[in-house]
Amino acid sequence: MDCGKDYCVKDLSLAEEGWKKIDWVSRFMPVLQYIKREFEEKKPFKGVRIAATLHLEMKTAFLLLTLKAGGAEVSAAASNPLSTQDDVVAALAKAGVKVYAIRGESREQYYEFMHKALDIRPNIIIDDGADMISLVHKERQEMLDEIWGGSEETTTGVIRLRAMEKAGILKFPVIAVNDSYMKYLFDNRYGTGQSTWDGIMRATNLLIAGKNVVVVGYGWCGRGIAMRARGLGATVIVVEVDPIKALEARMDGFLVMDMKEAAKIGDIFVTATGNIKCIRREHFELMKDGAIMANAGHFDVEIWKPDLEKLAVEINNPRPNVTEYKLKDGRRLYLLADGRLVNLVAADGHPAEIMDMSFALQAKAAEYIKDNHERLEPKVYILPREIDEMVARIKLESMGIKIEELTEEQKKYLESWEHGT
């Protein structure tokens, strides 16, 4: 462990390799490049302190460097103990970001490092799962008056924050970046869809075609996972609790059944619900020998490991990121990435082109909080549509795509009520 006054990383000497990764992904993130140039010129965050809890890998690093380019003092800690890339955080430390993260850090270190990131007494918090915002409300209440607001990247985090708002304990405004069109329509669907299977295939080196894939949850992440599984040649089964989403999955061409029925026939199970104990003892007991389980939800609670451990007579690790649970009857069940985010633990997370849009929204959310915090209430907000559209237009422009524009006559027609049959 290599720790100094403003950082704690595995090894600072890894920085050069980290810079190579950051440089590579930045070439495929034109929207964030555009915003970085804008921030470098205008310095909107001069004198502003920003603390972030994120998956500390190469795309996230480019976001943090973009905020720093805008004049911010930036600190960061990991939002998952297993998603940190040690070479990338070394590069961030060298660049002057106050960063505290080590891949494989303990639960105690996880919160210790988060406290260190908060020691800058931030004006803005950028969160991924709402752990940092929750920690401030529970243990660092003395700094609440200095916090203008925060932003949240994930579905899971937004659920937690809305619960805080409903309970009347949220003390500052938070932007639900996850709920922006340019986030959930692309990041949650196309990003999660591709990166989840990237992680599963890297971890197992197994064929997907011909297998029964059970996708638990048919939100935007589940949609993407199911879509890509079908594209890889799998028979896809969706498990849902929402009757509308279940019907949608069936109309999309997927089989739909409850978890007990799916447990009997699934070869690969992927959870994406944001909820607890979605796959548990009663389901493990029904699974076939060799069944593989992976989680694409934020926390490691969707596949209930305590039940697996109680059922197992032997636990082994046949491959990196694969845990084998041998049961009394001889069956072997496999859990990938210790039940944590398989796309970030066993692979590199979402593609750069996808995170380009999500992190452009995060950068603009921070600027929006800085400019508007005095009039915002302690509630969960969605970014204005014009910011969504700005990100979309820059992305289209970078792809060489020109779209149609409404004529004045068409605009007038859409704004009128007189025209009928």
Curated annotation (Swiss-Prot):
Subcellular location: Cytoplasm
Catalyzed reaction equations: S-adenosyl-L-homocysteine + H2O = L-homocysteine + adenosine
SUPFAM superfamilies noted in UniProt: Formate/glycerate dehydrogenase catalytic domain-like, NAD(P)-binding Rossmann-fold domains
Pathway assigned in UniProt: Amino-acid biosynthesis; L-homocysteine biosynthesis; L-homocysteine from S-adenosyl-L-homocysteine: step 1/1
Predominant cellular place of this UniProt entry's protein: cytoplasm
Cofactors, names only: NAD(+)
Keyword annotations of the record: Cytoplasm, Hydrolase, NAD, One-carbon metabolism
Any single GO CC term annotated in Swiss-Prot or TrEMBL for this entry: cytosol
Cysteines joined through disulfide linkages: none
Gene3D superfamilies attached to this UniProt entry: Adenosylhomocysteinase-like, NAD(P)-binding Rossmann-like Domain
Residues that, per the record, bind NAD(+): 154-156, 188, 217-222, 240, 275, 296-298, 343
Gene Ontology biological process terms from the UniProt entry: L-homocysteine biosynthetic process; one-carbon metabolic process; S-adenosylmethionine cycle
EC number(s) per entry: 3.13.2.1
InterPro entries: Adenosylhomocyst_ase-like_sf (IPR042172), Adenosylhomocysteinase-like (IPR000043), Ado_hCys_hydrolase_NAD-bd (IPR015878), NAD(P)-bd_dom_sf (IPR036291), S-Ado-L-homoCys_hydrolase_CS (IPR020082)
One Gene Ontology MF term: adenosylhomocysteinase activity
UniProt: substrate binding residues: D128, E153, K183, D187
Pfam families the record matches: AdoHcyase, AdoHcyase_NAD
Family per record: Belongs to the adenosylhomocysteinase family.
Function: May play a key role in the regulation of the intracellular concentration of adenosylhomocysteine.
Protein name: Adenosylhomocysteinase
Organism: Pyrococcus furiosus (strain ATCC 43587 / DSM 3638 / JCM 8422 / Vc1)
